[in-house]
Regions:
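Short amphipathic alpha-helical interaction segments
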Residues: 42-57
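Carbohydrate-binding/catalytic loop surfaces
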Residues: 39
């Protein structure tokens, strides 16, 4: 595993942890980006959206894009 791959995995894990503690297990991607940065995982919005799409494809989250920001909810 190279460094970039490790950082992508860390971003996905931190996003899931943030959602697990969010009200209704839901947050906007902009909020997730700030939480990740506060946890020391600096990620560009475009990169975060790619990782959120990956989590969606794997069935871990459900993403919705009503208007600009992407809403993310842990899949149940």
């Amino acid at each position: 595993m190279n460094f970039a791959e490790a950082m992508r995995e860390q971003a996905r894990l931190q996003a899931l942890r943030a959602l697990a503690s969010a009200p209704d297990y839901t947050a906007a991607d902009t909020v997730l980006q700030r939480v990740l940065q506060a946890d020391g995982v600096a990620v560009a919005m475009s990169s975060l959206r790619i990782e959120l799409s990956w989590l969606n494809e794997q069935g871990f989250v459900v993403t919705q894009r009503p208007g600009g920001a992407t809403g993310v909810t842990i899949a149940t």
